[in-house]
Amino acid sequence: MKNALLFAVLIFLTISCSSIKNTQEAIGNGNYDVAINTAVKKLKRNKTKKRNQPYILLLEEAFEKATAKDLGNIIFLKKDNNPENIETIYSLYEQLKRRQEVLKPLLPLYIVNLNRDASFQFTNYDDEIIANKKQLSDYLYSKVTTLFNRNNKFDYRRAYNDLEYIEKINPSFKDVRNLMFVARERGVDFVIVSMKNQF
């Protein structure tokens, strides 16, 4: 009985340590969101458990590095000044906001060994998200207008996909719904089928 209990405890410790090691490796490899998700999952169960203390430190590190990486990418893409990058910039701002929203329910996280609360630098990205959403909608709308002028079935299909995306991120933008209807009608292949009964 003692051997079985000892074996169970040993396996449990091995699994716990490997999970921490996997989270550390994710951070080391630059997979910050994987590390954040793993740490959040563990801390959601019980954030005060002593065994979960390493996850708080890992979460702090991963959050800081992920935020710095995304903000660095945004700065670079803005300097590039290519309209094709607007969607990526918008997505990065959305990702920054989502990452913060995942952490908020867990706070405060207390680090026992350091006798302090975990520190997460939160920023309100709403203005940037709204500005980029407007800019992206305008860019895609002008792209759709160009595709419509080509008067080609495949371009109407591409236009429909762009219009659908605009409607998703910015509902009721200009006359997007009407253009979606037109793009769908002009992008559809109609096939005539006739049936004959033969014996």
Model regions: which residues?
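Positively charged n-region of N-terminal signal peptides that target proteins for export
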Residues: 1-6
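A structural "domain/chain start" motif
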Residues: 24, 28-29, 37-40, 45-60, ...
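Bacterial Sec signal peptide processing site at the extreme N-terminus
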Residues: 11-34
